[in-house]
Structures are given as structure tokens and as C-alpha cells.
């Protein structure tokens, strides 16, 4: 029996020695990210969309963000910027934009820009209660963006309260 145990121990030691450092690896060790992975490809396309969006070429940006999301649906920033690009093209896109703002926030609940621009969308549609709720969340995430959203909400309230009045003389 002792000979049998020694033989098993020797065999196990030989296997470890032959396998080298790989035998000591742990399952949770990080794996290298392969080039051309879906997320990596999506980010390249997304970055192209950002350039187009900054140039105010919203239909072209929309197409790039949609392509990025087709490659990797889990990119919250692409959902946010797709929603922005849709919103900037007119009210006929507001429902679709809202779905993408909501998805961005599902994926990344602390994405301040999505609260900011969804709040603007709510303001544009007259839903000041939901715009104010997004403003309250922004106060915890990004006070500068919260101030910008507050200005949008206030300007809407002031505009609505003064409809039909003549402009003030300077």
C-alpha cells in the first residue's frame, strides 16, 4: 500500500513539473481580450458616431450608434448618444429616444449624461415631474449637469407662464 501511495505522489509531482506554471493558475485569472472582440469593435464604431454627433451630423451619428449596438448591445454610452441623436432630429423620435435613455440607465445607473438628456426630453414633452426626478438624481451624480438641467426646466416653466405676453423692453 505504501508503495502504491509513493508511486501516486511521484506521478502527481511529475505531472506538476511537466505542466509548469500553467498548472498553478487559478480559474479566476484574467484572460487576454482577443483582438476583434464584439465590444472592442463596437467601441471603434461608437467613437466614429461621437465624432459625427459633435459635428451635429445626427442622422449619420445615429447610424453609427445603431451599428455599435448591433455589435454589442450592452454599451450604455451608445444607447445614450443614440437617444441624443434621435432627439436632436425631432419630436417624431422622442419615443424611441426615451427607450434608449432608459436602456442606458438600466445598463449603467450612474450615467449622469443619460439623466441630463432624458430630463431635457421630459422637459420638451412637458413632463416636468419626471424631469425634476432626473434632476434630483443628477444632484447626487454631477452637480454641474444638474445645474444645466435645472436651467432647462426653469426656462420651460418661465416660457409657459409668459405665453402671449409681449417681450420686455430693454
Residue ranges and their predicted role:
Residues 47, 81, 117, 151-152:
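Canonical tetratricopeptide repeat
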Residues 55-67, 89-103, 125-137, 161-165:
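Structural signature of tandem alpha-helical TPR/SEL1-like repeats
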Residues 78, 114, 147-148:
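TPR alpha-solenoid repeat register
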Residues 26-36, 132-170:
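Terminal, low-structured helical/coil segments at or just beyond the last alpha-helical repeat
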Residues 40-67, 71:
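Alpha-helical segment of the N-proximal tetratricopeptide repeat
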